[in-house]
Regions:
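Short gly/ser/thr-rich secondary-structure transition/capping motifs
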Residues: 11-16, 58-65
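Conserved N-terminal subdomain of the carbohydrate kinase-like
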Residues: 1-32, 47-50, 213-226
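Conserved post-catalytic alpha-helical subdomain immediately downstream of the catalytic base
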Residues: 117-120, 145-225
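Short beta->alpha connector loops
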Residues: 35-40, 59-63
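Short beta-strand segments
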Residues: 6-8, 34, 57, 125
Length: 226
């Protein structure tokens, strides 16, 4: 149930996409490179070298077709947010904990650890099994929120990443604070749990603050975070 199968990838207009954004966007505090091409990711990261926090996602196509570019981007970011299959593909191991450590050390990236280390923090999205955050100062595990009715998981990874990074804005990039990372992951898990209940953005766009807070409080009690 938690394993995605890619039948075909059609890049269409993204095939030759070159990000061109306003000058004031180049001073963004938090930068998230979603699963675009490593070439685009590196371009955005190079233009935002003063960001407090940088993060990226990817998917199988780029691991297979531009591993060098992906490795270059991974050495520039603070946080990588991948699903379990992506972690194991990059880390070249069937154990995601082993793979994550190899990515963070740079061992499994193009050129190896001597070229440079990877991100300081790697978050593994594990579907119904929740998520695991491997941080240089420890490991965080959280279950998924038990959603009674699952409609469509499309976009949950992006919603998860967006909610997680939004919680880091007040921290001004202090990702070394592992408890703040834990709290951000709680918000990310809860937000993604709403997204899975509908197609597209319907559930998120119509979500009321009170309903969100009620589920957040329930999940906090479940995982022992008050």
């Amino acid at each position: 149930m938690d394993n995605a199968e890619t039948v075909s990838t059609e890049l269409n207009s993204l095939a030759d996409f070159n990000p061109d954004f306003p000058l004031d966007w180049k001073n963004s505090e938090i930068v998230f490179c979603s699963s675009a091409s490593p070439k685009s990711q590196n371009s955005v990261l190079d233009a935002n070298q003063g960001a407090f926090v940088t993060a990226l996602d990817t998917f199988a196509l780029w691991i297979e077709e531009d591993f060098h570019g992906l490795s270059e981007a991974l050495r520039k970011v603070d946080i990588a947010i991948f699903n379990e299959d992506e972690v194991n593909r990059i880390g070249d191991d069937s154990n995601y904990m082993v793979s994550a450590k190899k990515i963070m050390s740079g061992e499994s990236l193009d050129g190896g650890g001597l070229v440079g280390s990877g991100p300081d923090c790697l978050i593994v999205k594990r579907g119904s099994a929740g998520c695991v955050c491997i941080h240089r100062d420890g490991v965080i595990t959280l279950p998924a929120y038990p959603v009674p009715k699952i409609v469509d998981p499309t976009g949950c990874g992006d919603v998860f990443a967006g909610a997680f990074l939004a919680q880091l804005v007040p921290l001004k990039g202090r990702i070394a604070d592992i408890e703040s990372i834990r709290r951000a992951l709680v918000h990310a898990t809860v937000t993604a749990s709403f997204n899975i209940e509908s197609f597209g953005t319907d559930a998120i766009s119509n979500l009321k603050r009170g309903k969100y807070r009620a589920r957040l409080d329930k999940f906090r009690r479940m995982v022992g975070i008050i």
